[in-house]
């Protein structure tokens, strides 16, 4: 009898709490709009994470979700000529292949359209801006994000987002913390909008050295600490080897460390080849992954698939994959299945030709977008850390 009374009392209390929660949710939606608060399972935007491939299968696996997530901020940093811009251009090419729209904010004024074209970027559809100062670059970024029509935005680079006050000042003037305050304010404004618009925003950053560091790494990134906190993924990319063909350098082997990852376990690594002629060598990465997962056997310099030798040395196996895209497709899907990544559609697999190392000498067309500047670099009460 006592147990029945206790159960009824508990059930009544549960109903009252449920009614109170429903009333609170109704009040919040009435005040702030529908969708301002909801149960996590009912929000498909949060439960289903859309991703865009990085262009490197090994890096897609290291990220744990198959690529760069939508609606998030990504930071890619590393030394000079380590492959930062190449990696972002590969992501742009993958976005365009899926029918998405990409934008490149070239604050460094160094984008080479002929090189981008060799990486698979459709330069005719790529939106490019070359702003005059940091405030203008971030205003352009905000306008593109608020349009809800852009899938990927790349900002190259944070170090080149120079505040207007510094540009208008004299050489040698001290502008302590100006860029850090600019980045802090911009990221506070952009983060929520980026999430709602499902736009992936990639910041390329440079490395500086801290003075007087006795223990630990003296390296740090530019633009203060705000980007480190707001970024969902931070990638450290380094060149570890120069690839040569008949004593002539033809590319670099790079190592990417996932320093921070809010979407999957961090601290994983990926290694892949970046060729000067056509960017990330997809076939070379596939060979390494196939050997790692015992899909292709390696004995000395010989590689075998299903008991049959397919080539001596990685270059011969790479040519074998290019000549037999069906086999490459099958192996790649096996690798993807073993790493819980979505499988490829066979219709998308195409044979690619090995291009010679050439650079067009056409001048880059400057596309300057003028937008009203509203980002302030004045102190706003936040602690801003400079370079």
UniProtKB/Swiss-Prot annotation:
SUPFAM superfamilies: P-loop containing nucleoside triphosphate hydrolases (SSF52540), RecA protein, C-terminal domain (SSF54752). One of its GO terms (cellular component) is cytosol. Residues 355-387 are annotated as: Disordered. InterPro entries: AAA+_ATPase (IPR003593), DNA_recomb/repair_RecA (IPR013765), DNA_recomb/repair_RecA_CS (IPR020584), P-loop_NTPase (IPR027417), RecA-like_C (IPR049261), RecA-like_N (IPR049428), RecA_ATP-bd (IPR020588), RecA_C_sf (IPR023400). Residues 355-369 have a biased composition (Basic and acidic residues). One of its GO terms (molecular function) is ATP binding. The keyword DNA-binding applies. Keywords: ATP-binding, Cytoplasm, DNA damage, DNA recombination, DNA repair, DNA-binding, Nucleotide-binding, SOS response. It comes from the Bacteria. It is found in: Cytoplasm. Disulfide bonds: none annotated. The keyword DNA-binding applies. GO terms for biological process: DNA recombination; DNA repair; SOS response. ATP binds at residues 78-85. Can catalyze the hydrolysis of ATP in the presence of single-stranded DNA, the ATP-dependent uptake of single-stranded DNA by duplex DNA, and the ATP-dependent hybridization of homologous single-stranded DNAs. It interacts with LexA causing its activation and leading to its autocatalytic cleavage. Belongs to the RecA family. This is Protein RecA. It comes from Leptospira biflexa serovar Patoc (strain Patoc 1 / ATCC 23582 / Paris). The lineage of its organism: Bacteria, Pseudomonadati, Spirochaetota, Spirochaetia, Leptospirales. The gene is recA.
